[in-house]
Structures are given as C-alpha cells and as structure tokens.
UniProtKB/Swiss-Prot annotation:
Subcellular location: Membrane
Organism: Escherichia coli (strain K12)
Name of the protein in its database record: Uncharacterized protein YgjQ
Residues spanning the membrane: 18-35
Gene: ygjQ
CDD domains: YdcF-like
Length: 230
C-alpha cells in the first residue's frame, strides 16, 4: 500500500515538473517568435511601398520565387511587371528554387513576365535561390547588386530587407498584394517561424548561400541572361 502511494506521488510530481518545463519552453518559444517578428517589422519601416508612383526608382528589382501558378506567384509577377512598365526598375533578377527535377521557379517567373510584356533581354535568372537568404545575398555576391528593390508580399519583404541589412545590402521593398487570412493563414504561420530561423542563420550561424559561383553582370553588355530553358 505504501509503495503504491509512493509511486503515485512520484508520478504526480514528475507530471507537474514535466508540465512546468513544457510551459516554460512554450513561453520561451513564444517570446522568441514575438521578438523576431518585431525586429523585422521595425527594420523595414519606411522601406516598403505599395504605390508604384511613390516607390523610388532603382536599377534592379529582385523578384523572390514562389511555386509557379499559385496565388502568391501570380501576384508577384503582376507586381514586378507593373514596376518595370512604370520605369521603376530597369532590370529584373528572378531568383528561385531549381533544386528538384522538373521544378524551376526562375524559368517559370521569366516566362510569366514575358507574357506580361516584359522584354526577355531585361530578365536575369538566379537558379540557386533556394531560400530568401540565398536570393538576397547572391544578388550582391554573384550579380554584383548592392542597391535593390525586393519584390514580394509585404511580410516576405520585411524579412528579406532585414536579411539584406545583415549582409550589407541596401534594399527597399515593393509589396505585391497579399492573400486574405482565410487563404494565407498557413503561410503567415510559417513566416513567423521563418523569421526566427532567419535570425539564427544571420546572427548565430552567419550562414552563406548554398552556392555562389562565377560573377554575373546585370546590364546590356552581359553575356548571361535568362534563357527560356536553362
């Protein structure tokens, strides 16, 4: 009887300790997410625009990748094309994932932009934009661009601009229309975690892009561009 009672007490104490540890970990995780979120919102204040007439003109627009055909992709393409046609960027660097067979975000963006009337000769492809960090840092280290307009949804631009600052890049953002909460809830939740990951990558791990490679000059005299097929 006494042994059974002792086992019950140990079980209760252990359960309470586990619960306390779990609650503490949840509090730490929640605080970390909130801090990372606030840091990136503050870093991008007055550096993003949604009005094509108000955004400053720059030489290169960096269009961040998304799965071809999805709603984020379509809105980013429309926004990048509008920015180009308004004379706010001269060149478009489309950066996306090409790490899987038959999956090529950069070529998909290039073809969609051409369909919107953007000349093929002003589009440059970055096939190694496996993450936002890769896309932003490669824009400087591979394509030699230190003053860029990043094109994506506002939540994405905030993180990209913060990352750009950590790697010494002068970036502003032009915001593509977002989805409503009903359709974009999962993406918004994933973005909160991505902001924590970005802080770890930039501040703790000092991560560099997965691939760098030879330099590519963006401009009329470059031998490189964005062919219809890589």
């Amino acid at each position: 009887m006494l042994r059974a009672f002792a086992r019950l007490l140990l079980r209760i104490c252990f359960s309470r300790r586990t619960l306390k540890i779990a609650c503490l970990l949840l509090l730490v995780a929640g605080a970390t997410i909130l801090i990372a979120d606030r840091v990136m919102v503050n870093a991008s204040k007055q550096l993003t625009w949604s009005d094509v007439n108000a955004v400053p003109a720059r030489n290169v627009g960096l269009l961040l990748g998304a799965r071809p055909g999805n709603r984020y992709f379509t809105r980013r393409i429309d926004t990048a094309a509008a920015l180009y046609h308004a004379g706010k960027v001269k060149w478009l660097l489309v950066s996306g994932d090409n790490g899987r067979k038959n999956y090529d975000e950069a070529s998909g963006m290039q073809q969609a932009l051409i369909a919107k009337g953007v000349p093929a000769k002003v589009i440059f492809c970055d096939y190694a934009g496996f993450s936002t960090l890769d896309s932003v840092v490669r824009a400087k280290k591979v394509f030699g661009e230190n003053h860029i307009t990043i094109i994506s949804q506002e939540f994405h631009n905030q993180r990209a601009i913060w990352l750009a600052k950590q790697y010494g890049i002068d970036a502003i953002g032009f915001n593509a229309p977002d989805l409503n909460m009903k359709h974009g809830f999962y993406t918004q939740l994933r973005e909160k975690l991505a902001r924590v990951s970005a802080v770890i990558d930039a501040k703790i791990l000092h991560r560099q892009p997965k691939y760098l490679g030879p330099s590519v000059m963006i401009g009329p005299f470059s031998e490189h561009g964005c062919p219809a097929q890589k």
